[in-house]
């Protein structure tokens, strides 16, 4: 079985709970013979990926605080993930966050979607900027 993970949670941040979850999941899979996986990622500053042997993204820490650079690297990563989806060389797709860019690309392949928390739903008024539109995205993906 081959699992394809996308770029979303590893683009734009060095650390995070969701990226840590996927890092641990991929590390567990790395030691198994019956599971192959690929992380479709070209650019990342994630510290979790610094020393792993299954992903070697280009680091861009000198541009980490530059909004335009982050947008560019995010678009490149999304294009790369989209290309991998269209090629179809996987059995299961597991997106790492809630952006819906992949819905028209995954085809009939099975997909695993993990909802990590409901902070934005429960405390949306406190986190308007961070959670804006997140509930709607989650509903669209269901």
Task: Label every PLM stretch briefly.
Residues 1-142:
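Carbohydrate transferase catalytic cores enriched for Leloir-type hexosyltransferases
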